[in-house]
Amino acid sequence: VLAACSLIGTRELPGQAEPQVTTHFTASVRLSRVMPQAGRVELPEMTGHGIAAEDIYRVYFHGPAYRVLERAVVDPDGAAGFFAEGLPAEASAGRFDLWPRLIELCFQTAGVWDLHANGRMALPWQVDRVIVTPATVAAESLVAQVMPRAGGFDARVVDGSGNVWVELTGYRTTELPGQVEPSLLAAFGFAPRNP
């Protein structure tokens, strides 16, 4: 089954007769009776620049339920984002409550790398493909591995045994206007380049 999906928000604004309708995202979703098999990867050792959650969330604006990074490590080739334990329960708790947070873990880890490498803040714009695989074990030691690619990122979330839980390919962002405060960028290891 292939479904065309849209996330649409409607809000009434003061002084306007008609509600404002915004399409936030569109996607084609392929549903299958057979879940994809979880891949397995070797876990690389990350020895780059470490960034603590308190420094990340001085820049990021997420509330407690989506402060998914416990810490991150960045180097020129990519980033690792370590999933935070003990997040508040989601309002729609159930079997699938972990997947949005794991996708967000990829987004935020890519953002940390972008702050480190380019000193810029960006929001999600487009993802070419997302694959989620069935969880066969409890969520422990989950890590997002983010690899910069031409014009974007590829990412995956793996557990401590190397099992792949989520894969994103072709993730691209759009830069937010304005500059990040230089004193906040210092924690990310950003070093401005001389023109």
Predicted regions: what is each one?
Residues 1-195:
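Acyl-thioester-processing domains in fatty-acid/polyketide/NRPS systems
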